[in-house]
Every structure is written in structure tokens, then in C-alpha cells.
Amino acid sequence: MKKIQAYYILFFACMVSRLVSSINYIEDIDSLRFALSLYEYNISNLQPHFPGYPVFCFFVKIMYSVFENMGIAFSIIGGISTFAVIYFSLKITSTDIISLEGAFLSFIVFFNPMMWIMSNRYMPDLMGFSIALAVLYIFIYKDHKTSNLSIGFFLSGLLCGTRLSYLPLVLIPFIQHLVRGSFMLKFSSFLTGCLIWLIPIIALEGFNELVMAANEQTIGHFTNFGGTVVTNANMVERFLFLVESVWADGMGGFWLSRSWHTII
């Protein structure tokens, strides 16, 4: 089998599997906010919450306008993101997809329970992760021509509008390349990647309203309703929640109040 054929098969498998397992119900409050953003994008009304994830919402909105099905819209983006995660994982590890190692890597990422859940969930995590991997590949392994690096900086700007909290994943190579010559060109590429989503948000929300939403959500997340030591100082509970998130959510293992199927 040729490499390009293997990638086509992988892409088809990612899309079909995620579409078949798409969900048409709201799992949690964050999913509700992203679902409501398809009807009316309004950060001030927490549709979704700040920072708004405009790049992700934009592409999901396009899918929703075409298929008129919320579950399918999010799963299409999830399927594409799953393929991108596998693709750039293979690139970063310099692994051929048609090799035994490549097939194994593709298999464990494709069937990873957390990855599968996130590909169907109404959240931007997987899309943000796929962009972060693309940026890391360009910054670390790709030929470091100015044109290639400019693409990496542009994608970094898009990453800020997809999943801002994932920017630290690429921060070290980002800074290293930024200070090594052609500063203005690289910074301009990053700024373009940011402005392409920031200008529409400011026009839609209003600058003052956006700043107020940012202030309320940032302070609230770290001092009121977020999962920090300030909002929950019981370290035993925090440790148990950590174990649950890794074992049950990440590895798909059994936990109280979860389906008995997870025991298998």
C-alpha cells in the first residue's frame, strides 16, 4: 500500500467513526455554551464563555449551516482534528504510516478513549491540540526557512483563537524562533493570525464589552468557580479528581456512576 492511500484510508476512518458516534445531547455546561453559540455567538452572554474560541466556532458554524445537525457539525471538526493529530504525531516522530510503528501509533491515537470523546464533544480541545502539534512540527522539525516559520507563527495566532490555553505548548520554540532574525516578518505573521479573528470579535461584541467579559471570566475562573486551590483547597479531593480524570476520562476505565461496560 502506498503512503498516500494509507492517509486517505485513515482520513476516511476518522470521519466515518466520529460521525457514527456523534452525540445529539448536551454533556455539560461548557458544551451547552458552545451549542448555543451556533444560534447566537455572544461572549457577554457566555455563548461561549471568554475567550470565545472564535476560530473553532467559525468552522463549526459553517458545518452546522450545511448539515443543520449539531452533533454532525461538531463531529466533522472532531474527525478532521483526529486525523490532523495522528498526521502530525507521525511527522514529529519521523514515523512512516505504512510501517509497523506508524500503524501502531495511528491505532493507539485513533482508539484512545479521551481522544474519541473529545472528537465528539462540543468543545475546541482537539482542534486546538491538532493546531499546536502542527506548530510544533513546523518549529522543531520542518526546514526552518522564513516562509515555513511564518506559517508556524500564523498558526500560532490561530491557536490563540482556537484554544488560548494551549499556547504554552508551543511557547518555547515560538520565542526561540521569534528572536532569531526577521523579527518583524515573524511577528507580523503571528499578529495576522490573531487579528483575523480578533477584529471580527471586537466588531461583534464591542471593545468595552469584550474587556468586561474577559475580566469577569478570568477573575471568576481563578477565585470563584474554577478548579484552582482557591476554589477547592482540599488536596485529598483534588488528588481523587486527578486520578478520576486520568483513569476514567483519559483511559476509559471504570469509575463510580459510570457504565459497567467500562469494566471490560
Task: Indicate where each model-derived feature is located.
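Short helix- or helix-capping micro-motifs
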Residues: 11-14, 102-113, 137, 156-160
